[in-house]
Amino acid sequence: MGLTTVERFASRCIEIGVRWLIAAALGMVMSVPLHAQSTEAPQTHWEQYKHRNVPPQPDQHLTDPALVGAIDLHVHHDPDSYPRAVDAFEVARAAQERGLRGIVLKNHWTETGGPAYLVRKYATPGFEVFGAVTLDTAVGGLNPQAVRYLADVAGGLGRIVWMPTHDSEHEVRYNNESRPFVRVSRDGALVSEANEVIAVVAEHDFTLATGHVAGDEALLILRAAKAAGVKRLIVTHPMFLPQYTYMSLDQLRASVDLGAYIEIVGRSLTKDGESKDKTLAAVRTLGAQHFFVSSDAGLVGELNQTDTLAIAAKALRAAGASEADLTIMFKDNPAYLVKLPTLGGGAAPHAR
């Protein structure tokens, strides 16, 4: 005896339901994060960096005499496209409270002359706050118009132009990532766009920083900038991490021979390790007059800017730096690099 229409319909529904349950169960099994079954690609270095999920580091309220009158030329802040610990108003107020003379706001993706104007006006009147621009992909890479815009922003507070940082070809290739990058050189020579940007930096009397390029590229940039008439040059933290600029002692010596100032980021001195050892050795060998100290702090889960600077000062002092050396590295050289008089009224020691 055959099945009725109703019975056939019921049987079909049961079959579909069983198939759905089996598929759902298989989906649940396949979603279990077992290494043997996972088909997801691991997060890249940059994705991990952008999606930090760590608790904030409390302010330790550290102080040091070197901070009084200091200028931090490398201050990260919110708003940003990945987690920062404090916003621009908060970091400026904290720096002012600890006795700093000023800061330079830095963002990898946009200019900060505008934020500097607002911070000065509404958060810290009388405190020196300056802006900058970094030539990463968000501003068009090696885009001379981005430099011109910084010069035109109300307040005239732009001071530093960074060559590409997180989007530099060097960093992207070092981390083996597949994302857009900014190339500054080809076959051992700067690309034409780099030379055009350098010319605009010279025209507007900005300070030029080398960014996260390879060591040999940094030297190409410094030589071209000096030839173009750029007056103030920074080698961006070349003793910090190899995915950024990592220079040999000979390359550092060549940089200072070109008149550049070498950045020490406080983050490299907060923990023992290769970066700290390399930094202290470079200062001992080349002399404090060629260096300046910035924080490069601001990531969620890490020390804040003022605590970082205080620890850096103590580390340098413990390694043999004199109080005069600390004044040069925390106060005089940074002042020169943002076109302010030194506390003593003269030029920075290296620039004399």
Predicted feature locations:
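Mid-to-C-terminal alpha-helical segments outside catalytic/metal-binding sites
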Residues: 308-352
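Extended substrate/RNA-proximal surfaces in nucleic-acid metabolism proteins
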Residues: 126, 140-236
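Acidic (Asp/Glu)-rich catalytic clusters
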Residues: 116-125, 149-156, 226, 252-257, ...
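Catalytic pocket-lining loop regions of alpha/beta-barrel enzymes
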Residues: 199, 204-274, 292
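Divalent metal-dependent hydrolysis catalytic cores, especially in the metallo-beta-lactamase
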Residues: 72, 76, 90-113, 126-137, ...
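Short acidic/histidine-rich active-site segments
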Residues: 288-305
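An N-terminally biased module of ancient metal coordination in phosphate/nucleic-acid-related enzymes
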Residues: 39-127
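Bacterial N-terminal signal peptides
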Residues: 17-31
